A protein has these predicted regions:
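Gly/Ala-rich beta-loop-alpha elbow adjacent to hydrolase catalytic centers
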Residues: 168, 172
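Structural motif
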Residues: 68, 163-165
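Active-site catalytic motif of lipid deacylating hydrolases and related acyltransferases
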Residues: 73-163
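Bacterial Sec-dependent N-terminal signal peptides
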Residues: 1-22
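Short, active-site-adjacent cap segments at secondary-structure transitions
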Residues: 126, 173-174
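Short glycine-enriched nucleophile-adjacent loop
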Residues: 177-184
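Flexible, membrane-associating and regulatory peripheral segments of lipid-active enzymes
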Residues: 17-99, 103, 108-109
Length: 186
């Protein structure tokens, strides 16, 4: 009996051990380069750049759609070992996730509602929400600054007075809440 308790204690210690990853506080010198939304490559999706996979969801001609959909995607930067507060938009792994997971399985739901606009942005790491005082707040504000700039470019370059649907999920909703406040609240 005592031997079994000893094994249980050893197993409990083994299973409770985990690697500790020390996250540095947010520092401005480590901020990825800001995107220029006048350049099409800084958008995951524009109506002129729909992928063949995305076009499969179309049931109406894109020119017949009466509204635009500005979609801000959810948190994808979740790996514990990734110590960056914000992912650069040129990160190919992040781009792959945006295009092949989020756009195809979430944003595509809006493809028959309006022309789809999805900007890449310097997304904050998931830990930002639990470490607001250590740098999370700064990381989220940086991400929002990209979403806001993308929306400003969208309004000036693409909107042409069309109705707008603002759609989002997870971290994207954190940012669109402020977007609605900054652009639509009186």
């Amino acid at each position: 009996m005592i031997k079994n308790i000893g094994y249980f204690i050893v197993l409990a210690f083994l299973f409770s051990c985990k690697a500790v990853i020390k996250v540095q506080e947010f520092q401005n010198k480590e901020v990825p380069e800001a995107p220029n939304y006048l350049n099409e490559e800084n958008w995951a999706v524009l109506p002129s750049t729909y992928s063949l996979d995305l076009k499969e969801f179309e049931t109406k001609s894109i020119d017949s759609l009466k509204a635009d959909v500005f979609y801000v995607y959810p948190t994808l930067n979740t790996a514990k070992e990734d110590l960056r507060w914000n992912a650069p938009i040129a990160d190919l792994e992040q781009q792959y996730k945006v295009l092949n997971k989020v756009v195809l399985f979430q944003a595509s739901a809006f493809i028959t509602s309006g022309k789809l606009y999805v900007p890449y942005y310097r997304q904050a790491h998931l830990r930002s929400y639990s470490m607001l005082e250590k740098g999370g707040k700064k990381a989220l504000l940086l991400a929002y600054s990209d979403v806001k700039k993308a929306f400003e470019v969208y309004l000036k370059k693409y909107n042409n007075g069309r109705p707008i649907i603002i759609a989002s999920h997870s971290q994207g909703s954190t940012h669109t809440k402020f977007l609605l406040r900054d652009f639509f609240d009186d």
